[in-house]
UniProtKB/Swiss-Prot annotation:
Organism expressing this protein natively: Lactococcus lactis subsp. cremoris (strain SK11)
Cysteines engaged in disulfide bonds, as pairs: none
Claim: Cytoplasm is one of the keywords in the record: yes
Lineage of producing organism: Bacteria, Bacillati, Bacillota, Bacilli, Lactobacillales
PANTHER family recorded: CLASS I PEPTIDE CHAIN RELEASE FACTOR (PTHR43116:SF3), PEPTIDE CHAIN RELEASE FACTOR 2 (PTHR43116)
Keywords carried by this UniProt record: Cytoplasm, Methylation, Protein biosynthesis
Name of this chain's protein: Peptide chain release factor 2
């Protein structure tokens, strides 16, 4: 990398970091951190442990923003100093170090830009992702299991705790439905753009004639609501059924009815949890899913009213295809909203979907 190229990169990075400083309002950020630390130092702070944990989480999030900004700014200043020294006197080892630092700084800035883009009210929350294959039989159900693998690998690679809440086996292969919980900060923010219909085109391994098939699978994503958002669910409105449950692939089938299915009678929403070992645990998880769905339903209604006033007729529905995965006659994964695409389809199916997530966050600004 030539010094002139490094200089141009650092000038661009400097503009971005200055922009971060303006948007963050560092003085206000420091004041907010100080106020939270003062609250945490009070003798009665731990009297309400749930409230205390929220304060700690908020403090950690603000400190992370502040510390990450300072780290980028310090790295930029160090790189600029090294560039000045190299312009005065060549040093091969120092230039290699500067190239590595410039690359690392660019990566830090890109990550920080994404953090700033996660600014929606529920982006910081855990996420529940559901996969529902379409009407393509075994081929569609197998496609659902491929997407499950893709998302679980992505979550594990990014340090999220990944938990299967409910899993229903397919008739021959794959799955009929699955609910996956992603635990970690910003899980919902990263995954919310995955909501929609995912289309697969391939030569079906289940077709003896080796014909090309097109399958569709719907993905839904909801924030897992915390205690700061109250959703009232009347006991009289909920019908509970219990049944024997087993793990993915039909393993460890329980001899007692630990699986729980909840039906919200007024809306017809049905949720179920099967993976906990106890009926009580499954009921709690199913109720949390139901509350998230009811809250999402209310938010969708409000958004529909806004869209109607604006004359915006677009909506998330079964017909809203967001991404195509073509295995034959060529290999290509393309997002129909952002235009982002890649031919590295095997990497995508192994969970490397950051390019699509990042493109959606920028497109949705």
């Amino acid at each position: 990398m030539e010094l002139s190229e490094i200089r141009n990169l650092l000038e661009g990075y400097s503009e971005k970091i200055n922009g971060f400083r303006d948007s963050l309002d560092l003085d206000r950020l420091e004041e907010e951190i100080a106020l939270l630390e003062n609250d945490m130092a009070q003798p009665e702070f731990w009297n309400d442990q749930a409230a205390a944990q929220k304060v700690i989480d908020e403090s950690n999030a603000l400190k992370a923003k502040y510390d990450n900004y300072q780290a980028m700014n310090n790295m930029l200043e160090e790189a600029q100093t090294m560039l000045e020294m190299l312009q005065e006197e060549a040093d091969e080892d120092m230039q290699v170090e500067l190239e590595e630092m410039t690359t690392a700084l660019g990566q830090k800035i890109e990550s920080y830009e994404l953090e700033i883009m996660l600014n929606q009210p529920y982006d910081h929350m855990n996420a529940v992702l559901e996969i529902h294959p379409g009407s393509g039989g075994t081929e569609s159900q197998d496609w659902g299991s491929m997407l499950m693998r893709m998302y679980t690998r992505w979550g594990e690679a990014h340090g999220f705790k990944v938990e299967i809440l409910d899993y229903q086996d397919g008739d021959v292969a794959g799955l009929k439905s699955v609910a996956i919980r992603f635990v970690g900060r910003n899980a919902y923010g990263f995954l919310r753009g995955e909501k929609g219909v995912h289309r697969l085109v391939r030569i079906s391994p289940f077709d003896s004639a080796n014909r090309r098939h097109t399958s569709f699978t719907s993905v839904d994503v909801m924030p897992e609501l915390d205690d700061s958002i109250e959703v009232e669910v009347r006991d009289a409105d909920v019908k509970m059924d219990t049944f024997r449950s087993g793990g993915a692939g039909g393993q460890n089938v329980n001899k007692v009815s630990t699986g729980v299915r909840l039906t919200h009678v007024p809306t017809g929403i049905v949720v179920q949890s099967t993976m906990d070992r106890t009926q009580y645990g499954n009921r709690d998880k199913a109720m949390a899913m139901l509350k998230s769905k009811l809250y999402q339903l209310e938010m969708d209604k409000k958004q529909a009213e806004v869209d109607e006033l604006r004359g915006d007729q677009s909506e998330i529905s079964w017909g809203s295809q967001i991404r195509s995965y073509v295995f034959m006659p060529y290999q290509l994964v393309k997002d129909t909203r952002t235009g982002y695409e890649t031919g590295q389809i095997s990497n995508v199916m192994d969970g490397e979907i950051d390019g699509f997530i990042n493109a959606y966050l920028r497109w949705n600004l």
